[in-house]
Amino acid sequence: MTNKSSLKNNRKGVASNTLSGAEQANIGSSAMPDTNSTGPFSSVSSLDTPVVRKSTSPTGSQTKSIMNASGTSGAVVSNTPEPGLKRIPTVTFSDPKLGSLRSDVEQTPPNQVARQSSEKKATSVHIAAEGANQGRNLKDINTKVPKDGEASASSFSTPTSILSNADMGNNISSLLAKKLSFTGGTDSILNSDNSSDSPRKEHPHFYVEDPLHTPSVRSRSNSTSPRPSVVVNTFNPINIEREGSISKTGEPTLLESVLEEAMSPNAVSNPLKRENIMTNMDPRLPQDDGKLHVLFGATGSLSVFKLKHMIRKLEEIYGRDKICIQVILTNSATKFFAMKYMRKNKKQHNSIDTSFNSTNSNAGNITGNKKKVASLEKFSIQKTSSNSAASQTNNKQEEEKQMASTTGFPSTLGGSRTYSNSSNVVSQHPQIELPAHIQFWTDQDEWDVWRQRTDPVLHIELRRWADILVVAPLTANTLAKIALGLCDNLLTSVIRAWNPTFPIFLAPSMGSGTFNSIMTKKHFRIIQEEMPWVTVFKPSEKVMGINGDIGLSGMMDANEIVGKIVVKLGGYPDVSAGKEEEEDEDNDEEDDNKKNDTGGKDEDNDDDDDDDDDDDDDDDDDDDDDDDDDDDDDDDDDDDDDDDDDDDDDEDDEDEDEDDEGKKKEDKGGLQRS
């Protein structure tokens, strides 16, 4: 980028405060320029008497060089910085001893700038040192126009743009290593010339690659907004490479940049180890089981006992392999279940006590003894079962403690389930009259599941698990909490954190006066206007309370609630429709078979009739033939018979004649005797 800086020839000279009085006098003296320059390296001379270069063109001066008395080193002042940079003079030092070594190195730099047109020129002015040539005129001040691509050991080139070669820069350690390998020490680094034509990153005040001014990675807050002093040319938030920076000299150093100094450009903060991160998932709430997830919420009302019927109906419609149902119970709802369970247990205990009393009163009776033995056996079994249950709970608690001490996580996350049946002794919940496979939750479970920061939060997991939430029954207390946004229990916490893309059904159940209250209407209006994902069912008319009051405040019929749930979930499953179609097809096939059977039977009957007719015809023909034959035979027989009869008649006639003659003779003889 030296060609851009060389075009600005209208720059003024060095400020007067940077030069001594003698130097200003020498500059002010009038003299003609000398044109005896022999080459680009003519200014390099011995240590005692430095040779002043001659100028080859009368162009204006841009850079002025000052040599000290010893001639071992000089100071070069540049007053023509890159456009856009602050005009602050920069002083660098050079050593002529290293000129030849640097010239050899700089002949083949890794990032050599292409040769530019010879029409663009750069000027350098070398002024004689103070005390060596005090009386020298301006004609002794020689200028030189170097050819493009040539390097001078004692001149300072205008700094190249720090934004043009950002992708070719290295970090500070690689630059230091390169300098050390070329020059052989840190002293030569400080005295080396930074004016080579190689496109290295340079800045008037400091190294551009200084990590204190160019942080190489994103901040720990993951912010992509750069500081005002940092110019970033890339917009890729993932791969942020090193870029040149334009920084103020007075800007304070950031501790964040210092801490990020040793990190690579693409480095990422160390994440937590995977084995130490517990998956935010409760095993009792599987989300990828391919089932419909229905979450019921029950509050303290007498209609809470209809929950069992709704669960059974849904399972009958979908089947247990297609639907999964879980229940959230408030403290009031658990009290209703607990009171009912206690009544049942009290009746059982009373029956056992009465049986004991009867057995004791009828100790001599054999039947009484049998009852006593049976009751005693039952009592002993219950006692042993309670003892075994207590031992099992103790063992379970010990195992939980061991697991928590070894793994650091509660055992509830390891797959243990809390059921509503009495067989699970680990459960500390009151006995709930729900199916044994139904998982129910109470407020205490919120704290039993959560032990540390990485454990799942129950109401968040329930919100993620459920496809629909049905609060049935809904009391006025919970209604007010929902409308006002309170979340002081598990159910209201789930509703407060609910995803609006999933539906919520509310089935109110309260007294007539409570339902007709102004606050109740206000709460319903808030829910209707502000919560479009919530549907409030119309209550049913029924007798409320022991006083026989009839009001429109009872919970909707359980079958209607189930129907609305099924419709919201997409309608009745295709399995039942397929079964109905199969049944229709079976019925059609049976009808066809029946028709075919009846048609075959008719055809068989027709065939049989035809066969019978044919047989009859044949029989008739045969009969006719037989009859004819018989007739012929009969005729013959008749003829024969007639002949025989005739013969017989003749014989008979002859016999009769003989008899008549005999009689006559007898008569004659009798008469004669008489």
Swiss-Prot record:
Keywords from the named record: Cell cycle, Coenzyme A biosynthesis, Phosphoprotein, Protein phosphatase inhibitor
Domain of life (superkingdom): Eukaryota
Start-end of Polar residues biased regions: 15-81, 106-116, 152-164, 351-368, 403-426
Residues with Phosphothreonine modification: T90
Biased composition (Acidic residues): 580-591, 603-660
Pfam families recorded: Flavoprotein (PF02441)
Basic and acidic residues biased stretches: 137-150, 198-212, 592-602, 661-674
Composition bias, Low complexity: 214-230, 384-395
One record GO biological process: coenzyme A biosynthetic process
GO MF annotations in UniProt: catalytic activity; FMN binding; identical protein binding; protein phosphatase inhibitor activity
GO cellular component, one term: CoA-synthesizing protein complex
Effect of H459A: Does not strongly affect the phosphatase inhibitor function but abolishes PPCDC activity
Gene3D superfamilies named in the record: Flavin prenyltransferase-like (3.40.50.1950)
Disordered as annotated region, ranges: 1-164, 190-230, 348-368, 384-426, 575-674
Function: Component of the phosphopantothenoylcysteine decarboxylase (PPCDC) involved in the coenzyme A synthesis. Acts as an inhibitory subunit of protein phosphatase PPZ1, which is involved in many cellular processes such as G1-S transition or salt tolerance.
Description of how the protein assembles with itself and partners: Interacts with the C-terminal domain of PPZ1. Component of the phosphopantothenoylcysteine decarboxylase (PPCDC) complex, a heterotrimer composed of CAB3, SIS2 and VHS3.
PANTHER family reported in the protein's UniProt record: HOMO-OLIGOMERIC FLAVIN CONTAINING CYS DECARBOXYLASE FAMILY, PHOSPHOPANTOTHENOYLCYSTEINE DECARBOXYLASE SUBUNIT SIS2-RELATED
Similarity comment text for this entry: Belongs to the HFCD (homooligomeric flavin containing Cys decarboxylase) superfamily.
Protein name in the entry: Phosphopantothenoylcysteine decarboxylase subunit VHS3
Organism of origin: Saccharomyces cerevisiae (strain ATCC 204508 / S288c)
Gene that this sequence comes from: VHS3
